[in-house]
Amino acid sequence: RIGSELSCDKRFAPYLLKNSLADCPKLTDIQQKIAHTRIFTGTTTAINSRLHLFNLKHFTLAIIDEASQILEPDLVGILSARHDRSNAIDKFILIGDYKQLPAIAQQEEEEARVDDPLLQSIGLNDCRNSLFERLYKQSKEDFRSILHKQGRMHPAISEFPNQTFYY
């Protein structure tokens, strides 16, 4: 886990990157430990503050949960990360629901409006919208999927938002 002990449950503290590397006295030991670790977790903020990790490891997949709440500036470092001379991450899966939990922005509509025609041509019309929302609205059905079963609430309760907002 990449992050701080302050925001980590004590049960998971041994898995914090800092703690898991404590038994690595040499740089080569650190490199090997990172190279052999299959899964890394952390917030976008925590990972963006440690982009040097991508100098040590290439990833085949990054899953970004709650992506509908994350503005592009918070993702750009991860999306553009490099390993050697290629992309540090081969594939991204963005998970979220912009209708339920939109991006968090404090800008007013007028401040966030994009007037540049080139940016508008790629769907960037409002800086308060997440990359997830923009990609979702511009993508073809083949490139996205919708959750068909959820376990958080009784089906009768979930029927209202499903019919009102999604179908």
Residue ranges and their predicted role:
Residues 1, 31, 45-47, 53-167:
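Conserved helicase motor core of SF1/SF2 NTP-dependent helicases
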Residues 1-40, 162, 166:
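ASCE P-loop NTPase motor cores of helicases and related translocases
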